[in-house]
Amino acid sequence: MFRQEQPLAEGSFAPMGSLQPDAGNSSWNGTEAPGGGTRATPYSLQVTLTLVCLAGLLMLFTVFGNVLVIIAVFTSRALKAPQNLFLVSLASADILVATLVIPFSLANEVMGYWYFGKVWCEIYLALDVLFCTSSIVHLCAISLDRYWSITQAIEYNLKRTPRRIKAIIVTVWVISAVISFPPLISIEKKGAGGGQQPAEPSCKINDQKWYVISSSIGSFFAPCLIMILVYVRIYQIAKRRTRVPPSRRGPDACSAPPGGADRRPNGLGPERGAGPTGAEAEPLPTQLNGAPGEPAPAGPRDGDALDLEESSSSEHAERPPGPRRPDRGPRAKGKTRASQVKPGDSLPRRGPGAAGPGASGSGHGEERGGGAKASRWRGRQNREKRFTFVLAVVIGVFVVCWFPFFFTYTLIAVGCPVPSQLFNFFFWFGYCNSSLNPVIYTIFNHDFRRAFKKILCRGDRKRIV
């Protein structure tokens, strides 16, 4: 992505998509003469084989991981939530990076020149910027989706339909295209000038200062800033709400807003509980039923909600139809969470008069509620730590993979010399983000782990049978 063969010379531009002769590239030990001859590759045979193997593993891991994500979303009932369509689109972009961009970048790297012609050079550069930018903007969209689901819990989750999510995904691709394609149609193609004799064709991204700065801001710095601010805000909200001790909650905390009996509208019921990264499923259900700034409904269920949240919707979705538990009868209105409650756990209390006969009428409920509050308090502290870790991974990996490249890319544009080997390393390191996205956004989520196990172990079960 944004490939630059060498540091820029003042006033020398290689427009995007042009085939630029580059006689002075010091990375080539020899070149082919116009009449024929042999080309010396920029790397030794051992280094070339190592680079090919590493890039091949990167491509295989990227394709394999992202294909697993797509299959899991479309085959697991626990992952049918509309917001998981973001992951499908993100995985598709990463697969396209691994199949349509990385192979040609690898060939260009190990051969030392562009072999595939001018037309494919323009297409390759446009696709490179498009797919990589799309991957980054997808992460930004996921963070905004999570933020809105917290700050506008019921209202936003009622609007979070597959059609709306698809519209947002289309917007993400349009934004990426706006950043990627204008140089192909708006920049006049120019030669090297100065009467240099062609030596080797090279395929280089537009290095004009205005494009480098604007594309870097649009492709990385702006989405990165949005992600950081959004995640900081999410953490602040979660921290404020999870640190309200149960003993300080007022009697009003036990009541839920109208329509709170069924938790599906706020996106946290059995079919919508699975957030893209697992972070959304961590602290949010404890506060989303109240108005902004209010603590979550306090009741016996909260003591166990911390444990139940790990299973989210998967426990409900994977349980085959069978006899109902004996305590389900009088509590049909709590079907969303009741299906996830383990034997011995109490069911959600929707209001003073909504509890079933097993939840009130004796001192057992109050006695259990007191112990549950203490357990809930300890669980919330642990949950806050886990949530902090997930956010640190999401933001940290994103910045670590992309910041070095975009920083040096901008430095080159403004005239600061950067060693070509260092720039090439950062260039390839940015591609690693496409392979790490499945790890970050799925391995931390219990529902995806279950779906992956089902997909990967399906063949073993068939052989055993």
Swiss-Prot record:
SUPFAM superfamilies in the cross-refs: Family A G protein-coupled receptor-like
Subcellular location: Cell membrane
Extracellular side: 1-48, 112-121, 189-207, 415-424
Coiled coil: none
GO cellular component: axon terminus; cytoplasm; dopaminergic synapse; GABA-ergic synapse; glutamatergic synapse; neuronal cell body; postsynaptic density membrane; presynaptic active zone membrane
GO terms assigned for molecular function: adrenergic receptor activity; alpha-2C adrenergic receptor binding; alpha2-adrenergic receptor activity; epinephrine binding; heterotrimeric G-protein binding; norepinephrine binding; protein heterodimerization activity; protein homodimerization activity
Modification Omega-N-methylarginine occurs at: 368
Glycosylation sites: 25, 29
Compositionally skewed regions (Basic and acidic residues) per UniProt: 313-330
Bilayer-spanning residue ranges: 49-74, 86-111, 122-144, 165-188, 208-232, 390-414, 425-445
Keywords: Cell membrane, Disulfide bond, G-protein coupled receptor, Glycoprotein, Lipoprotein, Membrane, Methylation, Palmitate, Phosphoprotein, Receptor, Transducer, Transmembrane, Transmembrane helix
Family: Belongs to the G-protein coupled receptor 1 family. Adrenergic receptor subfamily. ADRA2A sub-subfamily.
Protein known as: Alpha-2A adrenergic receptor
